[in-house]
Amino acid sequence: MPPVCGRRCSRTGEVRRYPGSFVRKWKRVETANGPRFRSVVAPHEVALLKHLVGALLGLLNERESSSPLDELEVITGIKAGNAQRPEDPTLRRLLPDFYTPDDKDQLDPAALDAVDSLNAALRSLHEPEIVDAKRSAAQQLLDTLPESDGRLELTEASANAWIAAVNDLRLALGVILEIDRPAPERVPAGHPLSVHFDVYQWLTVLQEYLVLALMAT
């Protein structure tokens, strides 16, 4: 398979866990205004990230718009979240229950109702903040992408936003691929989801290299 990010160069590292895959590393540069994290993106990478992040933002906006109108929100300005568990499996992965007891399968109906009520209350209180944080990270990723291709330069704050947004993209793709921990290293050649899995691998290593750059001193 050709390098995911194009022709191999000095800034392109082999993804050893995924033979034949390549991804450009991030370079940490110390400046008077704090560290900067630099890399290069190809046109198809920019287009792919824009498409994936756009779909993610659409899901989050749809979830937010599904929240019922709360009279207290109108009075206090405090946003209330949707108390119901998302029906969409991708949103359920992005916005899981706040509390799941270890012995849930052994609980009686009354105890299960109590767990559901607790999760509903926690969703109503905290989900808007979580959705806003995910949306903000995704938007920062979009805002720092070049128009088509070229150099990337991230501040420490925007690098952390990239890590959060890319992680959400991986979670969303993981639902399509039915990936649970630990993720498989590869899928058979010719598998109908092999392209999606290649993208999942690329996002995983992109995130890993950026984390390593942030940790470097």
Swiss-Prot record:
Segments carrying motif CXXXC: 5-9
Highest taxon above the source species: Bacteria
Keyword Disulfide bond: yes
InterPro entries for this protein: AosR (IPR018561)
Disulfide bonds: 5-9
Assigned keywords, A-Z: Disulfide bond, Redox-active center, Stress response, Transcription, Transcription regulation
Keyword Transcription found: yes
UniProt-listed Pfam families: DUF2017 (PF09438)
Family stated for the protein in its record: Belongs to the AosR family.
Name assigned to this protein: Putative oxidative stress regulator AosR
